Design a protein with these regions (language model features):
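Short alpha-helical segments that sit at the start of domains
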Residues: 1-14
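Short amphipathic alpha-helical elements of helix-turn-helix/winged-helix folds
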Residues: 13-20, 81
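A short alpha-helical element within helix-turn-helix/winged-helix DNA-binding domains
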Residues: 26-35
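Short coil turns linking two alpha-helices in DNA-binding domains
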Residues: 38-41
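Basic amphipathic alpha-helical segments that dock to polyanions
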Residues: 46-52
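Beta-hairpin "wing" of winged helix-turn-helix
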Residues: 52-67
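Conserved segment of winged-helix/HTH DNA-binding domains
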Residues: 70-96
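C-terminal regulatory/oligomerization modules of transcriptional regulators
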Residues: 92-146
Length: 146
């Protein structure tokens, strides 16, 4: 599969923005410390989230804010913003099956449609998962710590 760590970094970032924004200036350095990820990567993810209209972010400015309510941000929105597989598809198929082999000649036609079904099902499920649910779970877990 071709979903990278950028997806979970983005979920972490958005959760931090919501949790800390009322009391703290949320900067890329702050987010880097929370995620344990290099600030350059954090800024790259923030730029992608900004381009998708999920956050408001200007490098060197007064912090990062959310552009829309958490219940209007889905896992799918984040996936499309930072990790969308675009035209190549979620699954990477080996490129050179042998045309001299009967299986090699026919494997693509037997498998491609099914892989597309799996990707569509995953994307549809991602559309149902909202960041408001993630943040609620994180807040409940933090409350239990105290």
């Amino acid at each position: 599969m071709q979903i990278t760590g950028r997806f979970t970094i983005a979920v972490h970032i958005i959760t931090c923005i919501d949790y800390f924004s009322p009391d703290h200036q949320v900067t890329s350095g702050f987010l880097s410390a929370s995620t344990g990820v290099n600030p350059v990567i954090v800024r790259g993810v923030l730029s992608q989230l900004k381009e998708a209209g999920i956050v408001n972010y200007r490098q060197g400015a007064s912090g990062v804010t959310l552009n829309r309510p958490l219940d209007q941000i889905s896992f799918y929105d984040i996936y499309k913003a930072v990790d969308s597989v675009k035209d190549e598809g979620l699954f990477r198929f080996h490129e050179h099956p042998s045309p001299d082999c009967p299986v090699g000649r026919n494997i693509h036609s037997a498998v491609d449609g099914r892989l597309d079904q799996v990707q569509t099902a995953m994307e549809n499920e991602m559309k149902e998962i909202k960041l408001s649910d993630v943040v609620q779970d994180v807040r409940e877990q933090i409350t239990k710590e105290h």
